[in-house]
Regions:
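N-terminal Rossmann-like or analogous alpha/beta NTP/dinucleotide-binding catalytic cores
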Residues: 2-139, 146
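Conserved small/polar residues in nucleotide/adenosyl-binding loops
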Residues: 150-151
Length: 151
């Protein structure tokens, strides 16, 4: 079985030094180490829309900025596959199938979903896309057969 990394960012704003120190520097190291057979780096625009649906233009513009930041930090398209989540329709399709396997009550018990709902004051009106983003993440992971997720 091949060793595959899946990593990426939601384009909700510009990347900053914290992104570089926290993950981008390590991604470049992993890319150059040749320890992994494949590295997929996703710009998760569909997931960014789950809590930015009111401003899709912001997300679209940030896709470009994040891609430029990736390149300027040393991520190399010859060594890593850089892609935009929404441009892979199979990810949406796989998410749809997975949604039939997960109950609403299970999503409601997810600690991350619970805390994010409270943080964003969504208690009375939770957008479905936001509520189901963990399913989308599972589809991303399984579609690429990732053995390491690096944030």
């Amino acid at each position: 079985m091949s060793k595959v990394i899946l990593t990426g960012d939601r384009p909700t704003g510009p990347l900053h030094v914290g992104h570089y120190v926290g993950s981008l520097k390590r991604r470049v190291e992993l890319q150059n180490s040749r320890e992994y057979d494949k590295i997929f780096i996703m710009i998760a625009d569909a997931q960014a829309l789950t809590d930015n649906a009111d401003n899709p233009e912001k997300v679209r513009q940030n896709i470009i900025e994040v891609a430029l930041d990736y390149l300027s930090c040393g991520l190399d398209p010859a060594k890593s596959t850089l892609f935009i989540q929404s441009q892979i329709p199979e990810l949406c399709e796989l998410s749809f199938y997975y949604m039939n396997l997960v109950t609403v009550s299970r999503l409601q018990r997810n600690p991350t979903v619970k805390s994010e709902i409270q943080m964003r004051n969504f208690e009375t009106s939770i957008p479905v896309g936001f509520f189901t983003y963990p399913i989308s993440q599972a589809a991303d992971i399984t579609a690429f057969h990732a053995c390491l997720l690096y944030t």
